[in-house]
Amino acid sequence: MKVKGILPGLVTSLVIAIISQGLAQFVPALGAATIAILLGIIGGNTFLKQPQLGRGTKFAESKLLEYSVMLLGATMTVQTIGKIGGFGVLFILCQMTITIVGALWLGRKLGFSQSVRMLMAGGNAVCGSSAIASIAPVIDADEDDKGTVITLVNLMGTVLMLTLPVLGMAVFGGSVILKGALIGGTLQSVGQVVAAASMINQTTVQFATIFKIMRIMMLVVVVLIFGRLHQRTIENELAEDAVVSGNGNGHWLPWYVAGFLILCALNSLISLPAIIGATAHTISSWFEIIALAAIGLRLNLVNFMKAGKRLALYGLGVGTIQVVSALILITLLLQH
């Protein structure tokens, strides 16, 4: 009975993901992930707004995104860090710190909850949907907040994906390393990084991917820090005898983030066969797109539009902080 209850929503999400992959061949600038979430939003708020899809879309949104995060670990190694050098690592660490602090500060100014601020900070600083899915359980974020931030981060990422290649060529000219740093150090998802860098050339793709992987490898650190910050907030509220939600389970590291870390360590130590990394990447990408379709199906467009102006300001503000800080840091640390 449980499988039967899940199937309608799961199959619907899969069909949207397949259609999105097909459409992405004709509109590569958008990418399958963005198309999936947009088609999901359209369907979920019109003819696919059916309660029988709820269990399946919830499963796809949560579980498939978790498996996607874990499988990412098999696609990277610690040795990657050496390819961008000490200043490259310093650039990524500074860029991520500025993004997180900036997103938390701006979110507070705009009146967003702590969970939305943390999801926005982690999603933009690390790796989009995967980071948001990893952070959500350790800060007890509800499904609505998670879906809203994932949608916002993906839409903002699409805008940056189309503009950063032009900006990179205008500012850094022929330097593929600097353009790769701008794209890989700023864009949210791996797919967006590859798509944006491909608009320049294949060498830029390679450098941009290395900078992006460095950010992904910081996922565990960000999850642990945010988990600790949330735990401290709960402790402060308890100390003040406030009413605290009982959702917290005290786990700072979700199982799939631990799995990500184990697979990354394993690949670093024994170098897994290329076929395993390629297969893990393909499955991870498909799981993410199916999950994004489900998130779109579950997103209440009316509620999303109610906060539309604030959300747009938040997304635009965080995106601006990222781009400006990246340009300054690249000039100071990498341009010589």
UniProtKB/Swiss-Prot annotation:
Keywords: Cell membrane, Membrane, Transmembrane, Transmembrane helix. GO terms for cellular component: plasma membrane. InterPro entries: UPF0324_pro (IPR018383). It is a multi-pass membrane protein. The chain crosses the membrane at residues 5-22, 26-48, 84-106, 116-138, 150-172, 204-226, 255-277, 282-304, 311-333. Belongs to the UPF0324 family. This is UPF0324 membrane protein lp_2841. It comes from Lactiplantibacillus plantarum (strain ATCC BAA-793 / NCIMB 8826 / WCFS1) (Lactobacillus plantarum).
